[in-house]
């Protein structure tokens, strides 16, 4: 895997984590909400999948849907959304009705 791919995985992970933070949703609640739309996964599996940042666009859209996200904030500078505090940065910059 190239360094560039790792940056994109970090962005995907932090986008989802930022959405969860801004909506106040835990992995346990995310698992319940996903189950309600037919996506069966447990809390531990979700935590591992998200922490790796390796998931499909379909999974990301399913998660954002059950979180009630209306749009996705993608920063122009990827460094704003990657790294140790990238998810917090995304959660703070999003308007209240978005992620």
Question: Model-derived features: where do they sit?
Answer:
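DNA major-groove recognition helix of helix-turn-helix/homeodomain DNA-binding modules
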Residues: 56-73
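Short alpha-helical "recognition helix" segments of helix-turn-helix
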Residues: 30-34
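Recognition helix of helix-turn-helix/homeodomain-like DNA-binding domains
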Residues: 36-54
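Short, charged recognition helix plus adjacent turn
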Residues: 5-6, 74-99
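A short, Lys/Arg-rich alpha-helix, primarily the initiator
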Residues: 1-26
């Amino acid at each position: 895997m190239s360094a560039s791919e790792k940056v994109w995985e970090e962005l995907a992970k932090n986008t989802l984590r930022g959405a969860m933070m801004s909506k106040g949703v835990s992995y346990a609640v995310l698992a319940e909400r996903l189950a309600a739309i037919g996506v069966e996964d447990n809390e531990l599996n979700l935590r591992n999948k998200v922490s790796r940042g390796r998931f499909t666009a379909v999974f990301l859209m399913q998660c954002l849907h059950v979180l009630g996200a209306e749009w996705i904030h993608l920063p122009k500078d990827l460094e704003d959304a990657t790294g140790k505090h990238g998810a917090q940065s995304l959660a703070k910059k999003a308007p209240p009705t978005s992620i």
